[in-house]
Amino acid sequence: MSILYEERLDGALPEVDRTSVLMALREHVPGLEILHTDEEIIPYECDGLSAYRTRPLLVVLPKQMEQVTAILAVCHRLRVPVVTRGAGTGLSGGALPLEKGVLLVMARFKEILDINPIGRRARVQPGVRNLAISQAVAPHNLYYAPDPSSQIACSIGGNVAENAGGVHCLKYGLTVHNLLKIEVQMLDGEALTLGSDALDSPGFDLLALFTGSEGMLGVTTEVTVKLLPKAPVARVLLASFDSVEKAGLAVGDIIANGIIPGGLEMMDNLSIRAAEDFIHAGYPVDAEAILLCELDGVESDVQEDCERVNDILLKAGATDVRLAQDEAERVRFWAGRKNAFPAVGRISPDYYCMDGTIPRRALPGVLEGIARLSQQYDLRVANVFHAGDGNMHPLILFDANEPGEFARAEELGGKILELCVEVGGSISGEHGIGREKINQMCAQFNSDEITTFHAVKAAFDPDGLLNPGKNIPTLHRCAEFGAMHVHHGHLPFPELERF
């Protein structure tokens, strides 16, 4: 199969007529709410990455799963692209609508279908909020582990699409590690069950394949998640440092000593001051960096680990280490971290949130590199990230009202992601690729790998109608971007024009 000319997978879509699609949906999907006027669709023109905006052809809001099947059948027959949207909190433009496509909003599917405390699992619809799962199972002393900062709003369907993580993913894993099975609706009408209620299933791991596929392979209609028992005890240490490099080295020292914290987060001075002004978490505003280290388990183990981590932090150069004295202070420490993004939004007209992953050993050097790039592009960068697993979230501060600043912020963001790749990391940790990072995929993967990605997509979506132009670039795009891998002086596909 040739992928070179599958341009529809990169945004070159067939012409469609709004009226004909609207009439077909009204005819074949009774009772469906359809938004089609400019006033109605404006609220859906972006996801959490509000710098990118496109108004869709139509917005559909089904309330029954049979309607989802019928919507996909109509779009399949008319060859109309479909972008699926959950809560719209994504930060990479993954749910950015297409001007020639239908936006399928799954937000009304908010029912928790079943809770099995003995089997430690819950079966939920895709529009259920992440935090709502933990709230629903709390009476059973259980919770759902992945906890992205947007957990009060983000949906579990969106979490599956992006393979979301959170501040506790170092110990408890990403979304993919906390799923048992999902129900998926394909564009051609086929329904699949991926995974099972058992902890392992024979055959290819299609559940893992779909998790993080950003709505490019199918539409998630039901999710069965694993539940964990709440730890009897959780303690948080807050360590202050006079340099981000020392804080970065301390992260590696903790892990090297065989300690796996429930959460291990870092913030630099700019983000510390912003969060403290916003939340009053008790952060030291004179520190160049802080580490938040949460240890959980049984009382005796936690007490021992707290003493060990305290010593490790001081030996690594911490100027001060504080142990949260009670649950209220522990919650306050975490509130500052979880509200760091909106806190930074209060000190800058706009900010651009990046998401890259690096090996822990590379943390000090990458932080130095980001500081150099910040000076080069004359844009401030606040660093907030999951230090334990090297998942960085540099926040690039800019003013969109200043001509050229957003373009400069985009370019700086791209350079930071390429720096992550250079040191053996990845251009995404949990936010996905979407439209935002599609060019950097050309730096992360070679042409053979990208061709394989397209082959996988074509196996599930041969017409390329599910969320086209996202996640996977065409080879043409990589040629234009100029980032295709050159091996022994040989440039793949030399017949493609370079720009």
Identify the residue ranges that each predicted region occupies.
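N-terminal flexible segment immediately upstream of the FAD-binding catalytic core
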Residues: M1-A73, G90-R120, S149, N269-H280, ...
